[in-house]
Amino acid sequence: MLAELQFTEARKEFSALYNEVFNSYRPMIIKRKQTEEVVVLRTDLQKMLLSGFSLKPEVLHEADGSITLALDQLDIFVNAASLEEAIKELIEDVKTYAQDYMQRSQLFINAPNRRPHFPYVLRVLLCENDEEIRGLLEM
């Protein structure tokens, strides 16, 4: 089982908590009241946990010569004149969706068709730039 701290203790000893999680690679659970729990985890370990959530879009060559990229995991689809334009549009749409998802997280987490998007959204939001997002898309 993971180590647990009560919220008040975690607040008082935040520096020690941070050092334990970061330097010792040990996630911790912080509890408040009877039902509220959060996990504190290093970002690199979170990225590792999410690495299995692949975001590889399907590439469709349309009859008019355009390219459609279909990212079924997030229900995002783009169409552009070239593959490179479609990739750029997809990256922008994925970023916009991820930001919107987090701004309205209570809505999306409680929507049965959007709840499964959470790990993909978090994976995108942990990227530092468009190149990292492009890498996630394997494009």
Descriptions of predicted regions:
Residues 71-84:
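A short, exposed loop/beta-hairpin motif centered on an aromatic-Gly-Thr core
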Residues 10, 69, 86:
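Hydrophobic pocket/interface hotspot
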Residues 53-73:
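Short aromatic-glycine-(Arg/Gly/Cys) micro-motifs in beta-strand/loop hairpins
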Residues 12, 28, 76:
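Glycine-centered loop/turn positions within well-structured domains
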Residues 2, 36-37, 75-77:
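Short, mixed charged/polar active-site loops
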Residues 1-5, 80-81:
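Non-catalytic interaction/Regulatory regions outside core domains
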Residues 7-23:
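The conserved cystathionine-beta-synthase
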